[in-house]
């Protein structure tokens, strides 16, 4: 695996996993330092199926640099302790091609997410998903998370429902047939709280 730059001092969010007793945290992508890692993840077979970005490293570098310069986008790496495990793209749907396919509302936050380290798929998916939602909802004005995963990605769709999303329809986007998945802040907070729900979450990763 590509040697990662940890850069813990750049963390913009962190939490202690109650089910794993490990720290999940997030920092912005550094296009120059992180390109090799993102390039490696984009060539993972499970990622290629849905992201279709198995590009040369130079093209990945240009892609990350473009996002870094875009005021309506931000890319992040997610870590478990000092291990990089995931990649997150956050965007403003009002300034994305998605705006032509669904009624954007104030407070919508778009997100693309992948778990790049295959050792953390499955057993850490719920903890990482919860942390990602909490990170997104801490953004100023964030009211609803918007996702548009490939309709074939049944594992991700099931996980999103478990995390408080609901399917609002299907969209024909330029690169895929997508499920429009929405998660309202109030629904997420209600779903992720309470002793019964905590037991369900713990059991899901037991």
Question: What feature does the model see in each segment?
Answer:
Residues 1-32, 189-206:
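Conserved N-terminal entry element of GNAT/NAT acetyltransferase domains
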Residues 40-54:
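Helix-loop element at the rim of GNAT/NAT acetyltransferase active sites that forms part
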Residues 54-75:
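Active-site rim helix/loop that mediates acceptor-substrate recognition in acyltransferases
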Residues 69-108, 114-120:
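Acetyl-CoA-dependent GNAT
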Residues 92-94, 148, 166-180:
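Conserved catalytic-core motifs of GNAT/GCN5-like acyltransferases
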Residues 122-138, 158, 162:
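Conserved acetyl-CoA-binding loop-helix of GNAT-fold acetyltransferases
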Residues 138-149:
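Conserved GNAT acetyl-CoA-binding A-motif
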Residues 151-169:
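Conserved active-site alpha-helix within GNAT-family acetyltransferase domains
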């Amino acid at each position: 695996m590509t040697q990662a730059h940890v850069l813990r001092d750049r963390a913009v969010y962190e939490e202690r996993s109650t089910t794993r007793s490990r720290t999940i945290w997030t920092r912005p992508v550094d296009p120059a330092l992180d390109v090799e890692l993102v390039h490696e993840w984009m060539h993972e077979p499970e990622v290629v199926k849905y992201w279709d970005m198995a590009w040369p490293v130079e093209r990945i570098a240009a892609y990350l640099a473009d996002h870094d310069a875009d005021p309506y986008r931000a890319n992040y790496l997610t870590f478990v302790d000092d291990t990089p495990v995931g990649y997150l793209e956050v965007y403003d749907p009002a300034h994305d091609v998605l705006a032509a396919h669904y009624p954007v509302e104030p407070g919508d936050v778009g997100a693309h997410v992948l778990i790049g380290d295959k050792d953390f798929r499955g057993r850490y998916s719920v903890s990482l998903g919860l942390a990602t939602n909490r990170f997104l909802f801490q953004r100023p004005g964030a009211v609803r998370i918007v996702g548009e995963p490939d309709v074939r990605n049944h594992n991700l769709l099931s996980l999103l429902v478990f995390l408080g999303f609901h399917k609002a329809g299907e969209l024909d986007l330029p690169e895929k047939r997508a499920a429009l998945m929405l998660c309202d802040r109030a629904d997420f907070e209600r779903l992720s709280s309470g002793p019964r729900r905590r037991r369900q979450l713990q059991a899901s990763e037991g």
